């Protein structure tokens, strides 16, 4: 069904009065095989067209055209099993494709420019033309994508699974998750107060340090007095003479826990070894150490240095408060959070989440994790049921290693500690569990030796050995 077409396949595109429509102005259907175009303006037109068995091809139709427009407003009776969504096929084909998966982007790729149209307050000839062009682009995208997916070896089953999953997730997005706003505001305020108080304590642990601002020439006016800027420097900075005619301005810098650069500098002084770095830019920038919560907490535990533990605790408080603030910003009028999910958003074909990132909620065992999770509540007379699968990627990896029982046993253990021990025994390298975890997932998702080596602060040659 998904990787073929015949005369039963029709592209469908709907134009309503908003993204949350209460009226459909026009629906255009286009036959994928014959290119026949039909315009439908009301429920009766649709009922006459829909009386035969058809398969409907849409672009984002599992999220908009069918659930928000046709089925609720025209009682279209479309079975989701008969819907093909080219947005899903596009993401499955190439999740991180340049310029994205929009119909406009695909139109550009095929030389079919999407018409610019913005007035959806009333039905116009321009709107109908706009809708027809969208069906033209969608039909071409569909025909191209099924050929490309077949060339890459995708099966009907894989397309079916992704469509069913997208349908379920779209329903999840529409329903949202009930959120305890009152408790969230209280927790947010408590965390911000703790963050502020701890920040003051940290500041006491790190005294100010001198920092050079600039170097200047000492110049005199004709009357023998110095220029005004010199007195301004004297009033504002410490002056260090480097010769009879030049001086440097210096100032004392107070530690600002909110500055990532200052945090990195102080932690490096305390012996912290970074495991993550910013991406390098084409112009040679980037590659700077990043402070991540997991590796810092591990270092705090290993080192026993109080200042490290304090910075780690401050980062947790800051991160949790920022996260709750984001949740509150995305809270709807229905007291629910309707987070967005791209079901094939990552190159690995895993989901990505936004507005807000609901996949990044701290676990119950993490600091303030239970308090954060308790904000997501069930509707009256409903219950929250939690389920998780352990080591899915590791089990898949074991399967491709051969699937023997010893591989499965190995992967079901603490994989990252085992890898840490193996690296130390076989290569003589000290490492952390966090580094080994990062390297393991990077490896199974296709990272090259340079990336593996970078995880441990090493070069690509060592990455190859690891």
Regions from the PLM with identified roles:
Residues 1-15, 20, 26, 126, ...:
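Conserved "right-hand" nucleotidyltransferase catalytic core of DNA-directed polymerases
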Residues 425-433:
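Short, basic (Lys/Arg/His-rich) helix/loop patches that form interaction surfaces
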Residues 20-25, 29-41, 54-151, 159-169, ...:
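Active-site-proximal helix-loop-helix substrate-binding element of RNase H-like nuclease domains
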Residues 9-11, 55-56, 81, 384:
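Hydrophobic "anchor" residues on beta-strands that sit immediately upstream
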Residues 22-26, 386, 393-426:
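Metal-dependent catalytic core segments for phosphate chemistry
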Residues 76-80, 196, 272-279, 401-413:
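Cytochrome P450 catalytic domain signature, combining two hallmark sequence patches
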Residues 44-51:
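Short amphipathic alpha-helix with an adjacent loop that forms part of the alpha/beta core around
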Residues 434-445:
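Short, amphipathic alpha-helical "recognition" segments used to contact nucleic acids or chromatin
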